[in-house]
Amino acid sequence: MPSLIDLRRRIRAVKNTQQITKAMKMVAASKLRRAQERIINARPYASQMQRVLSSVATRVDPSIHPLLTVREPRPDSKTLVIVVTGDKGLCGSFNTNSIKAGAAYIVESPQKCMLGLVGRKGRDFFGRRGFAVLFEQVGIFQKLRYEDARVIAQTAIDAFVAGDFASRKASAA
């Protein structure tokens, strides 16, 4: 039977752990709130950028760049599905929803699909199931840089321009 001192020590340790856990939750909630605010603040810029690019694309001669040309899908054409997930499981249902959306698109797609995987959880899920993968990017979320996004985009663009894919689909929850 533990002594009274041992019991008090254990109670104090549990209280300290609760205090640390509460502080960690508050920090995580603060980071999440800031990230959500940044996303909401970026929406007007993203929608305006989409309008500008759509306007430019309709006024420019499609022959000047291969991404502007409309292609008829070939019978053997594939679709590139880019699935974005986290590297850890500490993001609620984000990973699950993103993986489900990507898997559902692959199942419903009449064309053959190939994957571009961003994040460890997506790589692990689709890798275990033997899906065809064009590229993987893991570990980029610790310090997200423009260069990481540029590499992903350039890989997808190069494959599309080479004629490997007729269309592309991004999946993120």
Model-derived features: positions:
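Conserved loop-to-helix interface motifs that mediate assembly, gating, or partner/ligand docking
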Residues: 2-173
